[in-house]
């Protein structure tokens, strides 16, 4: 994994716009229903770049829909009031917030850069920010996560009134720090019975 101290946002924006221009004609005549900025942490891109691409999308795919849905995935660590407002201003209508867990211990095991309190506060800010919809991501099957840990996450997130939850079972990716920690016994994944109970608790 290559880590840069600064995200090359301008170069990436130019590349996305160039590819959009090159491919748009292949979809001419189709009605655009939604656009999704996902696949990692697009909130690191910045509202200016996202806004330029949204403008490009509207230019390439003119839509008569007033309710065109444009979703952005965001890490709670980036979800300040100013950042949320900036994305709303450039046309993002729906926010998907990657909470993953509200347990500090679980978040540390996942190498996340926010705490449970940070995540909950970010969700509450997002719900106040004026998006047409907000979604939160949660993971179960986490290392050393009990059924009680999982139901606590579900209960606390549901209590915010968030209209949509995306729930996933953890996938341990190859050649990651998490895989190494599981392989050498430093972390233990829940048994199949515990994971099944977590699924049933949903």
Residue ranges, per PLM feature:
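C-terminal scaffold of the Radical SAM
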Residues: 2-26, 30-202
């Amino acid at each position: 994994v290559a880590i840069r101290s600064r995200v090359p946002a301008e170069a990436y924006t130019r590349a996305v716009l160039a590819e959009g221009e090159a491919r748009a004609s292949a979809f001419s005549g189709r009605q655009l229903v939604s656009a999704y900025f996902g696949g990692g942490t697009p909130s690191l891109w910045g509202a200016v770049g996202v806004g330029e691409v949204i403008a490009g999308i509207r230019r390439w795919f003119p839509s008569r829909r007033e309710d065109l849905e444009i979703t952005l995935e965001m890490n709670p660590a980036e979800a300040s009031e100013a950042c949320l407002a900036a994305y709303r201003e450039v046309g993002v209508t729906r926010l998907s917030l990657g909470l993953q867990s509200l347990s500090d211990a679980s978040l540390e095991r996942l190498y996340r850069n926010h705490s449970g309190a940070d995540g909950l506060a970010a969700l509450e800010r997002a719900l106040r920010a004026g998006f047409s919809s907000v979604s939160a991501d949660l993971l179960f099957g986490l290392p050393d996560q009990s059924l009680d840990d999982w139901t606590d996450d579900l209960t606390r997130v549901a209590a915010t009134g968030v209209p949509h939850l995306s729930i996933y079972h953890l996938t341990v990716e190859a050649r990651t720090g998490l895989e190494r920690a599981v392989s050498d016994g430093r972390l233990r994944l829940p048994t199949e019975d515990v994971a099944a109970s977590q699924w049933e608790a949903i």
